[in-house]
Design a protein with these regions (language model features):
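Conserved acidic residues
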Residues: 31, 87, 156
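C-terminal and late-domain segments of enzyme folds
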Residues: 2-28, 40, 44-51, 135-232
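Class I SAM-dependent methyltransferase SAM-binding "motif I" and its flanking Rossmann-like core
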Residues: 98-102, 108-165
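Structural motif
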Residues: 5, 88-92, 120-121, 159
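Flexible gly/pro-rich beta->alpha loop and the following alpha-helix that scaffold active-site loops
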Residues: 65, 69-118
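A structural signal for short, well-ordered beta-strand segments and their strand-loop junctions
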Residues: 35, 120-122, 184-186
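ATP/NTP phosphate-donor binding region
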Residues: 14-78, 82
Length: 232
């Protein structure tokens, strides 16, 4: 399986060169991409976000033969046809629970994780690439309670993209969630490249496991981590 999990924010709004090199390594030409929305009814928002991402790829000399947006403007058979044709699939950010609901409704999981594709997920999309997703309560992000569900099954890790480390209320919810599964808390600069079960980590992150925090494979306090990465 080949995948990229992206936290969701980059200074200067550029796609890291490691991600570009990874894509070009496996798909040298005739790139066809399907963008999977988080809100299948937000047609204008989806189009705007996709156009921005296509421009960012173009700045890095990646162009696409075809670009598809997977949302409710298309029938279920049309979404399946688009995904079968695509060698790149990009799950957009937004409402995490709403996105997995639509993915299940349109029966997209098996098509997303075909071995011949590179799958990218940003923010909510990165979360939903997991196998057994454990999602901490976050009412500000439309997650009213701790949620556990079957993800798409592309990766075997749980992530918390662009984590607000100094939000003590939400961090306590993350600690509770970590009792059920380790969670990788991603800073804005963090992304993960998955290549045939090998995970390569870029940027700064910590692991939260049973309320304990780990940085560079060593147990640490949250403040030690924030001091190390100069978190503002």
């Amino acid at each position: 399986m080949r995948a990229v999990l992206i936290s969701g924010s980059y200074k200067g709004l550029s796609i890291p060169k490691e991600i570009i090199q990874f894509i070009n390594k496996y798909i040298k030409s005739n790139k066809v991409i399907s963008f999977i929305a988080s809100d299948f009814e937000d047609y204008e928002g989806n189009k705007k976000f996709v156009n921005k991402l296509v421009d960012l790829f173009k700045e890095q000399s990646i162009t696409f033969k075809k670009v598809y947006i997977i949302d409710s403007l298309k029938t279920k058979p049309e979404t399946h046809s688009n995904l079968k044709e695509s060698n790149l699939v990009f799950l957009l950010g937004g409402d995490t629970l709403k996105q997995i609901e639509y993915i299940n409704k349109f029966s997209l999981k098996e098509l997303i994780k075909k071995e011949d594709k590179i799958v990218l997920g940003i923010s909510a999309g990165a979360i939903n690439l997991g196998t057994k997703v454990v999602l901490a309560k976050d009412e500000s992000d439309n997650i009213p309670e701790l949620s556990m569900y079957e993800g798409i099954g592309v990766t075997n890790i749980n992530v918390e993209p662009h984590c607000e480390f100094r939000n003590q209320k939400h961090f306590k919810e993350l600690e509770e969630a970590s009792l059920y599964s380790p969670i990788l808390l991603m800073n804005d600069d963090c992304f993960i490249i998955v290549e045939n079960d090998k995970y390569s980590y870029y940027g700064s992150y910590i692991i939260l496991d049973k309320k304990n925090t780990y940085f560079n494979n060593k147990e640490c306090t949250l403040e030690d981590f924030l001091s190390e990465i100069k978190y503002d």
